Amino acid sequence: MEQAPEDQGPQREPYNEWALELLEDLKNEALRHFPRPWLHGLGQYFYNTYGDTWEGVEAIIRTLQQLLFIHYRIGCQHSRIGITPQRRRNGASRS
């Protein structure tokens, strides 16, 4: 089986650098939508559970992504993404 030499192909950012940048971006976005003390408690939970490990970084990235997705989907006031409540004049619902 043919393989490309290791020094060819697109340059990729090291995984740990990418993960830390992603975590920083998610943290900043989460701070716009959730209370700081609540996020601090969440961070403490992950630190107490995983310690200072990459497994903990991956777990908090997944959790923040899920929280933000659900928050947007429910209908964040800061975003146009999500389910917009529809008003009905006569109260009838369409199924």
Swiss-Prot record:
Span list, region Homooligomerization: 1-42
What cellular-component terms does GO give this entry?
host cell; host cell nucleus; host extracellular space; virion component
Q: Keywords of this protein's UniProt record, alphabetized?
A: Activator, AIDS, Apoptosis, Cell cycle, Host G2/M cell cycle arrest by virus, Host nucleus, Host-virus interaction, Ion channel, Ion transport, Modulation of host cell cycle by virus, Phosphoprotein, Transcription, Transcription regulation, Transport, Viral penetration into host nucleus, Virion, Virus entry into host cell
Sites of Phosphoserine modification: 79, 93, 95
How this protein is processed and modified after translation, per its record? Phosphorylated on several residues by host. These phosphorylations regulate VPR activity for the nuclear import of the HIV-1 pre-integration complex.
KW Phosphoprotein (keyword) present: yes
Gene3D superfamilies xref list = 6.10.210.10, VpR/VpX protein, C-terminal domain
Which Pfam families did the record assign?
VPR (PF00522)
Has UniProt tagged this entry with the keyword Transport? Answer: yes
Which InterPro entries does the record match to this protein?
A: RetroV_VpR/X (IPR000012)
- Coiled-coil segments on the chain, per record: none
Task: Note the HAMAP family from the entry.
Answer: HIV_VPR (MF_04080)
- Purpose: During virus replication, may deplete host UNG protein, and incude G2-M cell cycle arrest. Acts by targeting specific host proteins for degradation by the 26S proteasome, through association with the cellular CUL4A-DDB1 E3 ligase complex by direct interaction with host VPRPB/DCAF-1. Cell cycle arrest reportedly occurs within hours of infection and is not blocked by antiviral agents, suggesting that it is initiated by the VPR carried into the virion. Additionally, VPR induces apoptosis in a cell cycle dependent manner suggesting that these two effects are mechanistically linked.
Miscellaneous section: HIV-1 lineages are divided in three main groups, M (for Major), O (for Outlier), and N (for New, or Non-M, Non-O). The vast majority of strains found worldwide belong to the group M. Group O seems to be endemic to and largely confined to Cameroon and neighboring countries in West Central Africa, where these viruses represent a small minority of HIV-1 strains. The group N is represented by a limited number of isolates from Cameroonian persons. The group M is further subdivided in 9 clades or subtypes (A to D, F to H, J and K).
Question: Subunit arrangement?
Answer: Homooligomer, may form homodimer. Interacts with p6-gag region of the Pr55 Gag precursor protein through a (Leu-X-X)4 motif near the C-terminus of the P6gag protein. Interacts with host UNG. May interact with host RAD23A/HHR23A. Interacts with host VPRBP/DCAF1, leading to hijack the CUL4A-RBX1-DDB1-DCAF1/VPRBP complex, mediating ubiquitination of host proteins such as TERT and ZGPAT and arrest of the cell cycle in G2 phase.
What family is reported? Belongs to the HIV-1 VPR protein family.
Q: What is this protein called?
A: Protein Vpr
